[in-house]
Amino acid sequence: MFEKLSCHTSIKIGGRVKYLVLPNDVFSLERAITVLKDLPFQIMGLGTNLLVQDEDLDIAVLKTERLNQIEIKGEKVLVESGTPLKRLCLFLMEAELGGLEFAYGIPGSVGGAIYMNAGAYGGEIGEFVEAVEVLRDGEKTWLSRNEIFFGYRDSTFKREKLIITRVMMSFKKEKKETIKAKMDDYMRRRLEKQPLDLPSAGSVFKRPREDFYVGKAIESLGLKGYRIGGAQISEKHAGFIVNAGSATFDDVMKLIDFVRKKVKEKYGVELETEVEIWWNGRRW
């Protein structure tokens, strides 16, 4: 009955949950929510920007990875929320639709990316959204772009109880070779700078302001490689915390708190976490 979430998060941390449900389509997701209406639940995409407590959680988790259909409609694309971002980027390249190249190499699902308005290299996924289909109190409805707020690593979906099911996105025609060259460049930069060889939950902290680079600030404090238990500030990019071996939820949380304290002391800046935290069955 119980399923370890450490097998479903990119940082390889997480306790057991009562039920892990993998709906095959949007209808199955709706049905699962109806069945689980009296049991607390959380939605998970690919678990790539997520830190989960080690203790058992008395909840169900609905994992959307099987909701991965993509349809092309001219310069518009309808994509299900569990679709990996990498797969969407490759699909767009083949369709000669440009704009999302910056997202190539960002781990995670389309739904998770929309939820947090994921971005990199000056681009954000919210720029390409035309409408989002959601489940609100179990009812399916579409939100148009002017009904949706997107901010820096923030969106309507973080503030309201909405479950993203499908997204309509709009792109511009561009040559496949041009798109591929951009994607290859972004991937090369990621491989050079990010610790993709070790389990992590991605970038840990939000940038507090445009001119403040968190990784460089942490590095300036001499904290690259600093370790608490099995959690370590990456030696490659100080904005990442990696699981260097049997790290626990508490190890990572203590390291996050330590970094926040040191940055506050040196720079007077309060760091907010970008990574999503599940503790006591709630999102933080």
UniProtKB/Swiss-Prot annotation:
InterPro entries: FAD-bd_PCMH, FAD-bd_PCMH-like_sf, FAD-bd_PCMH_sub1, FAD-bd_PCMH_sub2, MurB, MurB_C, MurB_C_sf, Oxid_FAD_bind_N. The active site is at 153, 203 (proton donor), 274. Pathway: Cell wall biogenesis; peptidoglycan biosynthesis. Keywords: Cell cycle, Cell division, Cell shape, Cell wall biogenesis/degradation, Cytoplasm, FAD, Flavoprotein, NADP, Oxidoreductase, Peptidoglycan synthesis. Its cofactor is FAD. GO terms for biological process: cell division; cell wall organization; peptidoglycan biosynthetic process; regulation of cell shape. Residues 12-174 form the FAD-binding PCMH-type domain. One of its GO terms (cellular component) is cytosol. Its EC number is 1.3.1.98. It holds the Pfam family MurB_C. It catalyses: UDP-N-acetyl-alpha-D-muramate + NADP(+) = UDP-N-acetyl-3-O-(1-carboxyvinyl)-alpha-D-glucosamine + NADPH + H(+). Its main location: cytoplasm. It is an enzyme of class 1 (oxidoreductase). It is found in: Cytoplasm. GO terms for molecular function: FAD binding; flavin adenine dinucleotide binding; UDP-N-acetylmuramate dehydrogenase activity. Belongs to the MurB family. Cell wall formation. This is UDP-N-acetylenolpyruvoylglucosamine reductase. It comes from Thermotoga maritima (strain ATCC 43589 / DSM 3109 / JCM 10099 / NBRC 100826 / MSB8). The gene is murB.
